[in-house]
């Protein structure tokens, strides 16, 4: 069985248009088979976008696991900023580039297996992480983020209570100044500051 966090060229393409409105920002996306949440913006990502707080529009942002691009494109549109976006999935990167053009935003989207192709540090890393990769890889994603954050840089993520939000928060507090910003229907929005 194929997953959205893998490259599978055998998945038949079936592109569709998705319309999204978050915090009065209207966006249009092309989604496809083989990417996460292909039928519409998922509740966890929506909750993350409704809560993420970028206080400096002159900052650097990385969207980790960008899928077809809703997080990075939304942040680029809202804050009028260039966002770097990564995913291991080639189809996701291609969709992100199409969607950036469709929404008239500046992003830099590229393939990366976790942080293998990330060479700089960011003020913000924002993610709805791929929980289904398993705890070991999930923790690698979240704890290696520290090496790609500037001092006082922030990791923002969403995770469901049923997917281990409470235990993850305990573990994040060992490496970051981490806390819950908001909870909504079992989804935790976590902000982890690299200090």
Task: Please report, for each region that a protein language model flagged, where it lies by residue.
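N-terminal auxiliary segments of SAM/dcSAM-dependent transferases
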Residues: 1-22, 34
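Conserved SAM-binding loop and adjacent beta-strand
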Residues: 32-50
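Conserved SAM/SAH cofactor-binding pocket of Class I
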Residues: 44-127
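Class I S-adenosylmethionine-dependent transferase superfamily signal
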Residues: 75, 144-145, 172
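A short glycine-rich, Lys/Arg-flanked "PGG" loop and its adjoining helix->strand segment in the class I
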Residues: 139-151
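Conserved beta-strand signature within the Rossmann-like core of class I S-adenosyl-L-methionine
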Residues: 152-159
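Conserved class I S-adenosyl-L-methionine
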Residues: 160-175
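Core SAM-dependent methyltransferase catalytic element
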Residues: 183-195
């Amino acid at each position: 069985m194929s997953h959205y966090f893998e490259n599978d060229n055998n998945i038949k393409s079936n592109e569709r248009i998705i319309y999204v409105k978050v915090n009065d920002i209207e966006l249009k996306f092309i989604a496809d088979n083989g990417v996460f949440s292909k039928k519409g913006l998922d509740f966890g990502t929506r909750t993350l976008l409704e809560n993420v707080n970028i206080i400096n529009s002159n900052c650097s942002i990385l969207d980790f696991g960008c899928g077809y691009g809703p997080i990075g494109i939304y942040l680029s549109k809202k804050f009028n900023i260039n966002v770097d976006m990564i995913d291991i999935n080639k189809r996701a990167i291609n969709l992100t580039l199409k969607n950036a053009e469709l929404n008239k935003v500046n992003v830099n989207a590229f393939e990366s297996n976790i942080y293998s192709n990330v060479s700089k540090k960011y003020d913000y890393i924002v993610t709805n992480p791929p929980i289904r990769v398993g705890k070991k890889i999930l923790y690698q994603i979240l704890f290696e983020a520290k090496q790609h954050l500037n001092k006082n840089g922030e990791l923002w993520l969403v995770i469901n209570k049923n997917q281990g939000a409470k235990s993850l928060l305990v573990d994040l507090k060992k490496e970051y100044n981490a806390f819950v910003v908001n909870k909504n229907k079992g989804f935790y929005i976590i902000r982890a500051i690299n200090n």
